[in-house]
Amino acid sequence: TAVGCGIFTPYLENLTVNPSGTFEGTAITASSTDSMGAVISYKNNAGTNVLNTDIVLQLSADNGSNYTTATLVDNGNLDSQTKVASVSDVTVTAGTQLKYKIEFANQASGSKEARITGVALQY
């Protein structure tokens, strides 16, 4: 039988954390609404993120033409690392195409990093 030895060298890529940024969900078709709510789950990958300052949620019912900033409320921990925040009854411009946008601020590699792990919309 043959016996061999090999060396595996994984490819490493340096990641850069941007101090600010946004991401937007895809539209969900619903009955016409002018009031929305949401639940998000997130992790403080590094440091402690402040809701409504470092993590900002915006809601839209008109496919993102008009966003309304929501005031997130801390709902405690889902598990030892995952936190939950929510908002209800946010008045938005009426529509049938529900979307969310999350904005990040004050992020710094190794000292403050937010990781959003889930988003649920209510209408």
Language model feature labels by segment:
Residues T1-Y123:
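Beta-strand-rich ligand- or partner-binding modules
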